Swiss-Prot record:
<feature type="binding site">
    <location>
        <begin position="53"/>
        <end position="60"/>
    </location>
    <ligand>
        <name>ATP</name>
    </ligand>
</feature>
<dbReference type="InterPro" id="IPR014001">
    <property type="entry name" value="Helicase_ATP-bd"/>
</dbReference>
<feature type="short sequence motif" description="Q motif">
    <location>
        <begin position="9"/>
        <end position="37"/>
    </location>
</feature>
<dbReference type="GO" id="GO:0003723">
    <property type="term" value="F:RNA binding"/>
</dbReference>
<dbReference type="InterPro" id="IPR050079">
    <property type="entry name" value="DEAD_box_RNA_helicase"/>
</dbReference>
<keyword id="KW-0067">ATP-binding</keyword>
<keyword id="KW-0547">Nucleotide-binding</keyword>
<dbReference type="InterPro" id="IPR001650">
    <property type="entry name" value="Helicase_C-like"/>
</dbReference>
<keyword id="KW-0347">Helicase</keyword>
<dbReference type="InterPro" id="IPR000629">
    <property type="entry name" value="RNA-helicase_DEAD-box_CS"/>
</dbReference>
<comment type="function">
    <text>DEAD-box RNA helicase involved in RNA degradation. Has RNA-dependent ATPase activity and unwinds double-stranded RNA.</text>
</comment>
<dbReference type="GO" id="GO:0005524">
    <property type="term" value="F:ATP binding"/>
</dbReference>
<feature type="region of interest" description="Disordered">
    <location>
        <begin position="395"/>
        <end position="429"/>
    </location>
</feature>
<protein>
    <recommendedName>
        <fullName>ATP-dependent RNA helicase RhlB</fullName>
        <ecNumber>3.6.4.13</ecNumber>
    </recommendedName>
</protein>
<keyword id="KW-0378">Hydrolase</keyword>
<dbReference type="InterPro" id="IPR014014">
    <property type="entry name" value="RNA_helicase_DEAD_Q_motif"/>
</dbReference>
<comment type="similarity">
    <text>Belongs to the DEAD box helicase family. RhlB subfamily.</text>
</comment>
Amino acid sequence: MSKTHLTTEKFAQMGLEPEVLAGLESKGFHYCTPIQALSLPLLVEGHDLAGQAQTGTGKTIAFLAATFNYLLTHPLSNPRLVNQPRAIIMAPTRELAVQIYNDADTISASTGLKLGLAYGGEGYDKQLAVLEQGVDILIGTTGRIIDYFKSKVIDLSNIQVVVLDEADRMFDLGFIKDIRFLFRRMPAPTERLSMLFSATLSLRVQELAYEHMNHPEHVQIEPEQMTGIRIQEELFYPSNEDKMLLLLSLMEEEWPEKAIVFANTKHVCEDVHAWLENDGHRVGLLTGDVPQKKRMKILEDFTKGTLDILVATDVAARGLHIPDVTHVFNYDLPDDAEDYVHRIGRTGRAGKSGHSISLACEDYAFNLPAIEEYIHHPIPVSKYDREALLDDVTAPKRVVRNRQPVNRNMRDRQGGGNSNNRRRPPRKS
């Protein structure tokens, strides 16, 4: 683990219970990140907290350590029913809920606290069987949690800790009514520890915090550097005609070890995926229409390196802990300026450098002013040479293209990213 993103503060100095500390140290967590060093002392003292930090800075470990610690130091005075969890952690997506559960599982063994997972799309009966045995900490998405609540599988009247992760994404996905429904079934804010974490804390998120939390402390990490000091940003202005060929040309020039390509719609994602796959890249597709089991398999393959490129909608832009992403390509500039920050935050994590390349095409260039205003700096512009764009790629059968291709053999990426037939770069010097 790189130490460049850590502080000199140790978890052992945070006042955590020995069981929690043992769980953290067993997984190699000794030094705190900035968000952990600032938030844990407040949480250990019992203060509610609304924390803002860039993705990949350790928010998850911060709220998990605080949750386990609070439950160990605040035993219930009266016996609880088997269907009454003591803590609830809400996430906007299934993938994020699963990742939080996996992180929590590394700590739970040393604490004796039981975990439950609840998310939609699959596994209802399997999840139900675990919940019926009783859990201390319930992690999940709001829709499935509400399903279990209405079926009386769970009762929230003994909740001692509540965590809302990626709160602004909850608003974006329209889950705010679900969140308020669940909050109102829990004990009053003064009777529980509440945490809200997000990469951004918009006004609407702060209003939610004041509505359902007990005078929360606010913690922010590097708010002036919205996009991360280790991310090299770059912007091109392609015509719609050149856009796909520019992406393919840049992909060949950069030859990234691990890249995510973002587009604004699933249909465009499908087209981009088809072009990249047809061009010989090991590429996966992640959109809302992909079945849950396949989504998890794609993420697993991408994480372990079986896939080099992931094409995704913003469903993958928030919260997912995918290590070692070297490049992010914004094939479409996002409509929401905050999503630009979340997208490129997939790279440049854990003290490593990253590269973000955005294409401001004819359809989405108008999103650029709002993005640059939000991040407080202009994105450096690069020019490209149309004559240097790939002209020997074969279009996928179901995609109609404007420029006539010439057939060529697909490149082989099975060797892990070595290109033996490099073309002259499309960038103008």
